[in-house]
UniProtKB/Swiss-Prot annotation:
<keyword id="KW-0027">Amidation</keyword>
<protein>
    <recommendedName>
        <fullName>FMRFamide-13</fullName>
    </recommendedName>
</protein>
<dbReference type="GO" id="GO:0007218">
    <property type="term" value="P:neuropeptide signaling pathway"/>
</dbReference>
<keyword id="KW-0527">Neuropeptide</keyword>
<keyword id="KW-0964">Secreted</keyword>
<feature type="modified residue" description="Phenylalanine amide">
    <location>
        <position position="7"/>
    </location>
</feature>
<comment type="similarity">
    <text>Belongs to the FARP (FMRFamide related peptide) family.</text>
</comment>
<dbReference type="GO" id="GO:0005576">
    <property type="term" value="C:extracellular region"/>
</dbReference>
């Protein structure tokens, strides 16, 4: 999973 743009 991609947690780069997790806000």
């Amino acid at each position: 999973t991609n947690d780069f743009m997790r806000f």
